Amino acid sequence: MGKYILSVTLLLLVGGSVAAQETNTVSTRFGALTVDEAGVLLFKSAPFKPTIEANNSLDLGKPFEIGAADVVLVTDNGGTSCPALYYFVTVTKSGAKVSPAFGSCSDLITVKRNGESISVSMPGYQGPSESKRAQLRAARETHVFIYHAGVVTENGKPVK
């Protein structure tokens, strides 16, 4: 009986450590995007240059097939000062390219595909260290980021 309990306990411990090392993966037509256990974004098991590393965690969206490219929205989950920033990864047969980070820090987004473009809309954001007035003013703003042909813009200007 004691051996049985020890065996079950060991199985639970081993199973728990495997679950803690799970990776986040999305398949594209041209290879897999993966977030490794350290929170680094990989394409075909290799990190991007410069490295895209999670603040707290990275979430990978479902790929959009746009012509000869698959486009994936990546969410970089942060903390209370900036809950989320975003990247688009454009994956083609010749490789993968990451956009500059964009967003207002809000994690409340609406994503829509419009033909060959993708829009990401969100309210403005001011963190808890800002005044309530500043937080309310920011929440009334709407920021719209447009992905088209590998470029992300806000108000017609490229995000840098």
Locate predicted features.
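Acidic, small-residue rich beta-repeat scaffolds with periodic aromatic anchors
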Residues: 20-40, 109-160
